[in-house]
Amino acid sequence: MVFKYLAIALSVTLQAAPPAHADTTLVAVAANFAGAADAISAAFHVDTGHIAQITTGSTGKLYAQITEGAPFEVLLAADTKTPEKLVAEGQAVAASRFTYAIGGLTLWSVDADLIGADAKVALLSDKVRFVAIANPDLAPYGVAAQEALTKLGLWDEVQPKIVLGQNIGQVFAMASAGAADAAFVATSALAGPDAPVSGSRLDVPQDLFTPLRQDAVLLNAGKDNAAAVAFLAFLKGDKAHDIIKSFGYDLAE
């Protein structure tokens, strides 16, 4: 009888344990998703035993690194075009591509009194000398900021105040440090456990910019790596979805 219960307990333990052989995968992540990616990576390791090593940057720079031979195995982009382009160029697995998050754009300042209900009043204020956005040539969130300013009829007036960050994470850092009086940041930067508790903000209406649908794709370098395949599968699951939503993103329907 003792042996029977011991066998059952051992069976349950083996079923619950991570795989005996854990692998590592190299994941390139758009800067806006850095915090969420770190949290997902930690949960992924607990669940599977695999390790996802996260490298962040602008989608444009990550694309350039991939095409130049960087050994990334998974890409979490800030747009849909870059994964699509990598598939078309034969550098990624077509069937693996999916939308993992939909981002938002927020005008934010560390000054609690600077930004009210009218973006025009804030951006044209004499108190605002510098407005930070991500470089539109490198970062989809920079494109979104430019689109929003153009649709609001403010691009020409605000352009002399604009300073560029190489990615949306750098833009948030500039605004946080006071190097920019206001900034168009990823809404996710103002959510999650490390979000600032002060400042003023105005969420940019979604109809002012092309939806920030963010696609993931398995790169050719990772198609034979169990950890890379498992990471993308985990990204589609409930645990990852809960983390993604906690950082202020929407999920694709």
Which residues does each predicted region cover?
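Bacterial N-terminal signal peptides
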Residues: 4-16
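Boundary at the C-terminal end of the N-terminal hydrophobic targeting segment
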Residues: 16, 20-22
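Exported/periplasmic ABC-transporter solute-binding proteins
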Residues: 22-56, 60-70, 77-80, 84-89, ...
